[in-house]
Amino acid sequence: MSGTKKVGSAGRFGARYGLKIRRRVAAVEAKMRQKHTCPVCGRKAVKRISTGIWQCQKCGATFAGGAYLPVTPAGKAVRRITE
């Protein structure tokens, strides 16, 4: 695993690109890699398959979402309007 305890996955960049950007990348990737809630079964078992494609490990539901998170702010607003 590349990186260190302090910077996580952004350690692969070394001293390049600046601290602020590397911290931002590490934060986004940490959120992306955690388990998310499935919109079908409600379990915390959703993982990213590819860019914008998410799949529940429990029920097998596959759906499109954001590039780094399964639910985007725009998607939340649309869902709120339609319900």
Curated annotation (Swiss-Prot):
Keywords: Metal-binding, Ribonucleoprotein, Ribosomal protein, RNA-binding, rRNA-binding, Zinc, Zinc-finger
Cofactor: Zn(2+)
Note on how the cofactor is bound: Binds 1 zinc ion per subunit.
Zn finger (C4-type) location: 38-59
Pfam families: Ribosomal_L37ae
An individual GO BP term: translation
InterPro entries on file: Ribosomal_eL37/eL43, Ribosomal_eL43, Ribosomal_protein_eL43, Ribosomal_zn-bd
Superkingdom of this protein's organism: Archaea
Segments crossing the lipid bilayer: none
Function of the molecule: Binds to the 23S rRNA.
Stored PANTHER family: 60S RIBOSOMAL PROTEIN L37A, LARGE RIBOSOMAL SUBUNIT PROTEIN EL43
Subunit structure: Part of the 50S ribosomal subunit.
Family listed: Belongs to the eukaryotic ribosomal protein eL43 family. Putative zinc-binding subfamily.
Record-given protein name: Large ribosomal subunit protein eL43
Lineage, top ranks: Archaea, Methanobacteriati, Methanobacteriota, Thermococci, Thermococcales
